[in-house]
């Protein structure tokens, strides 16, 4: 299979900071019938993020947006931003997204999604 045809799957786990996050794809029908969501971050051990598998399998901008959205919930939780001021929040998200994009297991999937579209 040529490099252009390579399929990069969403990883099963992403390690970021002190957390190892399990990524779980759930059937579209379950996501929408249970609570009308596309993704859900669970902020209690073991930390998990649930994704509508239909959106993830379609790939592209919607999938990237969904994944980044749910990981931003993790960043909010990880950096305890609930009662923080703007500069602290912006700095925390800058640090979190840099780690997510540059050093996590998600990097290859994100790059593949960007390059194929």
Give the location of each predicted region:
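Acidic/histidine-enriched, beta-strand-rich ligand/metal-binding domains
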Residues: 99-106
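Active-site scaffold of zinc-dependent metalloenzymes
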Residues: 10-61, 74-78, 82-96, 117
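Alpha-helix boundary/interfacial micro-motifs
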Residues: 34-35, 69, 86-87, 104, ...
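Long, well-structured alpha-helical subdomains associated
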Residues: 108-117
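Juxtamembrane/interface helices at transmembrane-helix boundaries
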Residues: 1-2, 18
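Short acidic, Pro/Gly- and aromatic-enriched capping/linker segments at domain boundaries
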Residues: 2-12
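Catalytic glutamate of the conserved HExxH
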Residues: 66, 70-74
